[in-house]
Amino acid sequence: MNIIEIENLTYSYPAAETPILQNITLQVEKGDFLAIVGNNGCGKSTFCKTLNGLIPHFITGDFSGKVVVDGVNTLEADVGTLAQKAGYVYQDFENQIVRPTVLDDASYACLNYAMADYVERGKEALALCGLEGRENDYIWQLSGGQTHLLALAGAVSLRPEVLILDEPIAQLDPGHADRIYQVLKELNEKHGKTIIVIEHHTEYIADYCKHVMLMRDGNIAWKLPTSQALRRVGELQECNIFPPQVTLAADKLRRQGRLPWEQPLPTTIPQGLEAFRGLSLIHI
């Protein structure tokens, strides 16, 4: 079952000479964990903003084609309705924090929808995002990673089936980055949420994502299972996307004749340990 269906999507910003998105057609299955990669300016963030209706309802321009998210045509619904279909955590997530305490902020969206159970929804979202017990804390008491989780909780409180995160670990240390992705993994695997991340940290993509979509010049170059995608070393590097270090090491060994060409490149550490078993790596 597809949770997202896009047909012939083309979009241009006002006064732009050329479209930033060009004739995109895509299906995303319910329960997928999709990473979107590509170089700067290829249209990743613009594309994702069509999924929650910011484009074209809030950000105007020339829009054509069809975008359906969880059964709703984005052209036929307002952004308030679409926020309950596709939650979005932006790269500048601090701007999504608007209330002084943790529970106030997590439940604020539901309060604005006049939901009678807004407090319960906020508490539920905080628990799902690993912030249970922090309800009465002030937001300034949170770390950067916890603040990011709070922004995610605000989106989760509306119970959308799709969650979109733009560069979720760009400002975080490895410990908090791991925590963010563990929360996303649980939301995906235990609660059936479809997760879409704009990401360039390919080690995290390898460990957590099910599919990878490469965007280039406003088009989708391909969408592939993660292992297949990350093995396209040269193509990714052309787009300034660096495959996992274990993949790059194996690719170099293969070019040196020390790994067979028919052996698939490893994309995770466990795969690398198996691939490199018995090799002397002194000369890598």
Located regions from the model:
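Conserved ABC ATPase "signature" region
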Residues: 116-134
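H-loop/switch region of ABC-family ATPase nucleotide-binding domains
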Residues: 199-200
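Catalytic Walker B motif of ABC-type/P-loop ATPase nucleotide-binding domains
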Residues: 163-166
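Conserved ABC ATPase signature
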Residues: 138-142, 146
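ABC ATPase NBD Q-loop/coupling interface
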Residues: 66-81
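Conserved catalytic motifs of ABC-family nucleotide-binding domains
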Residues: 159
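Conserved beta-strand-loop-alpha-helix hinge in the C-terminal portion
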Residues: 219-246
